[in-house]
Amino acid sequence: KVEKLQSKVLNEQREVVVQLPKGYAENPDKKYPVIYRLDGAGNLTMMNAVLESLQSQNAAPEVIIVAIENTDRLRDLYPTANEDPNGPVGYGGGGANFLSFITTELMPIVEKKYRVHDFRVIEGASAGGVFALYALSQKPELFNAALTYSAAVWWNYGASAKSTVAFLKSANHLDHFIYTSIGNEGAPMRPYYNDMISGMRANQPAGLRWENEAYEGVTHNLVSAASTFSAYHHLFLSAYLRPQQFSGDIKSIKDYYARVSKQRGEKLDAPEWVIRELGYHYVGKQNYDKAIALFKYDIAEYPQTPDAYNGLAYGYEQMGEYKKALESVNQALALSTSE
């Protein structure tokens, strides 16, 4: 759906394309996270292909996409005017106004007309990547994540690289996600980008999830295509906690699903089989104490589910604790026959 609005901040008419999830009309009570995609609806085909693949595996939620069309791209997406002769001198500097347009004019319309919850992502490439980093640093209370592809941080002698590092350095804790990537960039881009990555690594605050990837041999204009799957895959938490994501602390299961719930705007708990599979994983590693603790936690969460007791029985059997295994099997049978 195309939304047109007359912006008082920018003093011009702006156009955005709002794409709703396929099941939007069939789920009138459901709310969705929002991706604000810079550089317009030309990105929707690629975004949809990646998101649908992830959604088919429950590895990403359904989302509302707000694709913002350009009018004066350099003006809007660069926060500072460029003084570096490697680029167009005097261009840029309208980022603050553009951010104000998004947060004070566009967002209120989106949140009034559509069923959204408060998990918001800002995503962009090149100049759009610069703006996404800027938006997160200026409005961390509004954006939960910034996805940036080959962000043109060389602009104005690396102003964006420096401000991004300064933002992270000033943050004691940041419960956000940042994705950065780069292709086969040379000068003037690469030195500023490398400095930014080094600074981000040295000043990464507690709580920040950050992924950085380099796609050597991939040109600047193809980095978005190379990065989109990885960015979404790292950003969105699967509804199914995998063993490699499990810290080993049972409390972390609830913490993980609290974060999944925050992303998806609905309360999600660990499915019974997910907890049981974690137990099986530790049986396979012969870490029986951890496995038994997980199986017992599974029973505590799902006391009326026979399979939870079967998991515990399996753990005890592998330990050679046959009496305890038999007790668990009998509990599973009792529940099965009472159903």
PLM ranges: what are they?
Residues K1-M319, S328-Q331, T337-E339:
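Non-catalytic cap/lid and distal C-terminal segments of serine-dependent acyl enzymes
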